[in-house]
Structure formats: C-alpha cells, structure tokens
Design a protein with these regions (language model features):
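Terminal RNA-binding accessory module
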Residues: 1-75, 357, 364-365
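Phospho-regulated, low-complexity intrinsically disordered regions of nuclear gene-regulatory
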Residues: 476, 524-548
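DNA-recognition alpha helix
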Residues: 478-490, 500-506
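Short Lys/Arg-enriched helix C-cap and helix-to-coil transition segments
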Residues: 510-520
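Short, charged amphipathic recognition helices of the HTH superfamily
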Residues: 471-484, 495-496, 510
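Flexible loop/N-cap segments at domain edges
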Residues: 199
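Extended interfacial segments that mediate partner engagement and assembly in macromolecular machines
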Residues: 59-71, 77-186, 205, 221
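Rossmann-like S-adenosyl-L-methionine
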Residues: 2-10, 18, 219-472, 479-480
Length: 548
C-alpha cells in the first residue's frame, strides 16, 4: 500500500522519535506525526510520502494518550525549541531514555547495555542560563523578537519563553522598547542590511548575575548609553552590557569583537562548591542545577583517590576538571577557544587550585602532543561538541591506556558511534546514565564510564563440577543472564560492577572484568543493600553459591 498526499488515515501512535514526533504504522508504513503522543488515536492528513514512510499532521484527536497534556506556551506549536511540551515530563524522560538505549544498541552494537534510569530535572522551566534571540520584523515592518520555527530561519514572535528565567524577559522587553523608539532597523539575512541581529543573554544562576549583549551589523548603536540605563533600571542582577560586532554575511550569531558599554565583561558563577568566571564566548552548561548533577556523576565514574592524573579534553572554562581537582593528583585541561582557556586559568586561580594546567589547542593535537611528552593519564574526560570525537582522537586516547575514560555526550547517535570504536580499541562501556539537561526540548546528555575490557565477557570460574554437584549448564551463567534474572524477578537493574562486588563479598572467584577497579583504593560506586540481596539470590539460583 502506498499512501497518497492529502489522504486521511486513522492511526494509533506507538512511539516517539528523537525529534519529539509521534510515530505509528499504516499497512506497515511508518507515519511520523509532529505533536502526537504515544497512545494517541488520531486522524492524520498525509503531507509527504516515500516508499516505506510518510509524514502527516493531526486532523483530529480521536482518543488522546493518557500522557498528553495541553501546552502552556502559546508559541510551542510554531517555535522549534520545545519538542515535548505536549506530553507529561515523565513520558518525556521515558522517550529520552529510550532514545539513548536505541542509539547505543542499534548504532553502537552493544547488547544489554548497563543503562541506569535517566536523571530528571526538578524544574522543567526557567532553567536556561543562555539565550540567543533573533531580531526581525513582521509584515507591517514592526520590530519583533522570538525564536526560529523548526528547520527554518523564520522568526516566530515570542516575548516570553518558559525555558528562560525572569531577567531574560525583562531584558528583552527593555531592549524592544528602546529599539522601537530608536528607529534602528532589524538585520535582513537576504539583503544583509539593517543593524539589529540578535540579543544575546547569559546568567550566572549561582550568583544571579546577568549579561546583556546586542549583536549588531556594525560597530555600535546610537544611544547606547540610554539603552544601558534602561537595562540597568529594568533587569534584575545586571552586571554587564556589551556590543558584539558581526558584519559577516552569515547566519553565525556572534562576531569576533566585543565592546563593553557598561559594567564588566564577564560573569561570576558558583557551581560544585567553586567559583567560575564566564566570558561571552565561554562554553558553560545551560542548566545550572542539572550540570551539577552531571559533574557529580562524572566525578563518581572517574573513581578518583587523590593520586590520578586527569586529562580533561574539550574542557571549556574548566568546570569538569576543576570539580575533580580536589580528588586528583593533577588535572590537564585542553580547549580550542582561547578566551575559554583564559577563563579556565582564572578559575583555577580564583579557587586556589594549583594542580591544574590548561592548554589552548585542538583536542586531537593536544592528545598527540601529550603522548609525545610521555604523559600517561589515569583518567581521560571527554566532553565533545555534538559531532562527537574524531577517530584519530579516539585512537590517541586509547594509545594512552588510561584506566578509565569518562565520556560526557550531548548526542546519543555520535556517542554510540564513538563507543563502538572505543570497543574495537579495547575499551568497553560500563555504567551509562542519561541526564536531562534540556527539559521540554529534544536534547539529552549521557555520561558513560569506559574501562579496558577483557576479551571474554563471561565470568571466569575454574570449578570442579563433580565436587560441587552442579551441571555444566548451571555453571556458565553470564553476567547478562544474572542481570536478566534479577530484572525479571526483582524488577531491578544491576551493573556488572555490583555483581563482581557481591561475588567477592561471598568469597567467589572473580575474573578480570572491565568494571573492576584497578586498585583496592579506587573509589567506585558501592552496591545498594536491596541489589546485593537480589544478586545473592540470583547466584544461589544459578548454583554459584550454596543455599543457606
């Protein structure tokens, strides 16, 4: 059956895509429907067809999903920012966790990956500490501001974004009031004329400090001082008013030159018990509360004892590496953005951290240089951009032979691709935890602990079967079989690390497993009591420990 354009079909939505669309099937053909929720029964108009799939739009909701909710944002159907505002947050978290699992299994080729439950956010709104708001004009020529529609550069007017904090709304209101009176025109991407391009906003949630930056097609604005005065009057926590000059005929938001109109040219934030200086171009996670949870998890996976050398690649302003410095012997951070490296060094000095150094280099080049210098880090932290790591970088990191690699990813697909190459080079993914840094949007972060794997993933046991009176089949329970038994009978997920810990506690032999620590002093997650009980019972079931 080939669906036709404008055909109306009845469909039940059975899943969600990474983009937040619902997906169902009609006669074996997958139909993708934006704004649909898993469990919806819909009438859908077909908009575009192919041999094995089609795209449609909702004509009528025949029976809503229990997870469907009314969007609380008037712009959500047009704006390309929020992909999940039409479903409950619990359902959104399930969709994101499934997305991570699907990528790691399908692209990465991992069977039964040890994926822990996603770390959700306490607050799904008002969390963003950075915004880039395009300025344009409507059909009547009036100045407007908002966000781009999905997959386009058409501005959807939106004066109040639910994801942003109150000071950003205050800044936008004040800026538009000033701009409409000033007579300044909006930049036109087609003609490359007009002055006002973007309003760029940053906030340090830990201190409440706010930065407002006007991105202009030129060197400045007429009446800058009056704008700064209005912003100072209206914006809570304002510390910085800047002009960014961007004369390029491009859709890149920021130009290379910044000028301070009022205040300072940086913000100071508090995170993970430390202070961080943030410049306009510095990479800094956009969700303060969830970033702290993410970094705590990365530190836990690093298993530091106070002696290790940590190599922090793509370090930005040094947040991850500096958060680990108090538990490491030495930290080496690498970042390609010069201003971010300068901030990282300032941040180390600001916090009296003397065991950290920062290099301004490409990550792959820096890794090769460190190999040539004979550096052998114990732990490597990777926090690459969305495109993931280059193959040559992965090979260089593997050549360094660190005991652990902590990979922080913002894209499940490129993460899965990189995990596959790491596995080929002798590193296997152990603990995997998704973290929702971007509630209501399609994005999700993931933290992975990799360590050198044993070529044979089965438990290594050398037992006399006759003496123990068990069958050959009973003696060959793999870690995955133990995990499956516990999940089926106790509804608990356990890691290979926890199984190894319980086996050792029971006096059983444990082979060289990739989840085991390299030394007795290495700090690793400890098995919770309820999981220890379940593992013990599973080992009894497989006759690997005597019944008592």
């Amino acid at each position: 059956m080939l669906l036709k354009k404008n055909e109306i079909v009845e469909i039940e939505i059975t899943g969600m895509t990474a983009e937040g669309s619902g997906v169902g099937r009609v006669e074996g053909i997958a139909v993708f429907v934006p704004g649909a929720a898993a469990g919806d029964r819909l009438k859908v108009r077909i908009l575009k067809t192919a041999k094995t799939y089609a795209f449609g739009k909702i004509e009528e909701i025949l029976e809503p999903s229990p997870e469907r909710i009314e969007s609380d944002c008037p712009c959500s159907e047009q704006c390309g920012g929020c992909a999940f505002r039409h479903i409950t947050y619990a359902e959104e978290l399930r969709a994101k966790e499934n997305r991570v699992r699907d990528a790691i299994e399908r692209i990465g080729g991992l069977q039964n990956p040890d994926i822990h439950p996603i770390v959700g956010a306490e607050h799904a709104d008002g969390y963003r500490n950075k915004a880039q708001i395009p300025i344009g004009q409507d059909k009547q020529g009036n100045l407007i501001a908002g966000f781009y529609a999905n997959h386009s550069h058409r501005i959807v007017q939106c004066d109040c974004c639910a994801l942003q904090p109150k000071p950003f709304e205050q800044a936008l209101d004040a800026f538009l009031e000033w701009a409409r009176k000033s007579g300044e025109s909006a930049y036109d991407e087609t003609t490359h004329k007009g002055k006002l391009r973007h309003l760029y906003l940053r906030m340090a949630e830990g201190t409440g400090e706010v930065m407002v930056c006007m991105v202009v097609n030129g060197n400045g604005l007429k009446g800058e001082d009056s704008l700064a005065a209005l912003l100072r009057e209206r914006v809570d926590g304002l510390k910085s008013v800047l002009i960014n000059s961007n004369r390029e005929d491009t859709n890149v938001v920021l130009g290379r030159r910044f000028r301070t109109v009022w205040g300072q040219d940086f913000l100071t934030d508090r995170m993970c018990g430390l202070q961080f200086r943030i410049s306009p171009l510095s990479f800094y996670q956009v969700n303060h509360a969830q970033a702290q949870r993410l970094y705590a998890l990365a530190g836990e996976y690093a298993g530091l004892t106070g002696k290790e050398t940590v190599l922090d690649l793509y370090c930005g302003t040094g947040t991850i590496g500096l958060s680990m410095a108090g538990r490491a012997g030495r930290v080496i951070g690498v970042e390609a953005v010069a201003q971010a490296v300068e901030n990282a060094r300032e941040n180390a000095a600001l916090n009296n951290i003397e065991n950290a150094e920062f290099l301004c280099m490409d990550a792959a080049e820096a890794a090769q240089l460190l190999v040539q210098r004979g550096e052998h880090p114990d732990v490597v932290v990777l926090d690459p951009p969305r495109k993931g790591c280059a193959p040559e970088l992965i090979r260089t990191v593997a050549d360094m032979a660190p005991s652990r690699i902590v990979y922080v990813s913002c894209d499940p697909a490129t993460l899965a691709r990189d995990l596959k190459l790491f596995r080929e080079l002798g590193y296997a993914a152990g603990l995997i935890t998704p973290v929702d840094l971007f509630p209501r949007t399609k994005h999700v972060e993931t933290v992975v602990c990799l360590s050198r794997k044993n070529p044979d993933d089965r438990i290594e046991i050398d037992l006399d079967l006759d003496e123990l009176d068990i069958t050959s089949a009973e003696s060959k329970a793999t870690y995955e079989e133990i995990k499956d038994y516990i999940l089926k009978n106790y509804n608990l997920k356990v890691s290979s690390l926890y199984i190894s810990q319980v086996k050792r506690k029971l006096g059983l032999e444990v082979g060289t497993n990739y989840n085991l620590p390299k030394s007795e002093n290495t700090q690793v997650p400890q098995c919770p009591p309820e999981k220890e009980t379940a593992i013990t019972e599973a080992l009894k079931h497989f006759s690997m420990v005597p019944f008592k």
